[in-house]
Amino acid sequence: MHYPEPISKLIDSFMKLPGIGPKTAQRLAFHTLDMKEDDVVQFAKALVDVKRELTYCSVCGHITENDPCYICEDKQRDRSVICVVEDDKDVIAMEKMREYKGLYHVLHGSISPMDGIGPEDINIPSLIERLKNDEVSELILAMNPNLEGESTAMYISRLVKPIGIKVTRLAQGLSVGGDLEYADEVTLSKAIAGRTEM
């Protein structure tokens, strides 16, 4: 069907979001058209602000308004332990359980040769540099329990072991093929407590 150009552009824009197909994008576009102008302006401003006002922490790679982020700045954190996660949503999930007191390192992805993503395409080089400069005794690999997550964890483990840092993996209990961000707090808490050495 042919839509007016502004609607077509909006549908195309919504389809750039993960999980949004043509039908959902169309519904969102027409819902936006029905919204009050003030609400649309506020929505558009929120989209622009998230890109302009947020950055990535130069230490851990987590999203932040200030660099370094509040977690890296917190002197009460256990600086001898770093939990490596795939994305920012994983940090938020871990923080919700309020049990982990160490630092983080956000990779912004996982190794996926099928998608053309190698170790140099995610935040692994900065992790290795960080481990050389900081006094870290344990690295917790909290990748998602899927093929890409397992590959990434094994790759990092092989890189880090020669440095002499203990490398652990979250205990299973997380469903294979699932995403860390969707795990409940009890499951995450048990996974941290039961982590195993690699």
UniProtKB/Swiss-Prot annotation:
Protein name: Recombination protein RecR
The entry's keywords: DNA damage, DNA recombination, DNA repair, Metal-binding, Zinc, Zinc-finger
Zinc finger (C4-type): 57-72
PANTHER family cross-referenced by the UniProt entry: RECOMBINATION PROTEIN RECR (PTHR30446:SF0)
Metal-binding in keyword set: yes
Annotated Toprim domain residues: 80-175
Cystine pairs: none
Superkingdom classification of source: Bacteria
Entry-linked Pfam families: RecR_C, RecR_HhH, RecR_ZnF, Toprim_4
Gene: recR
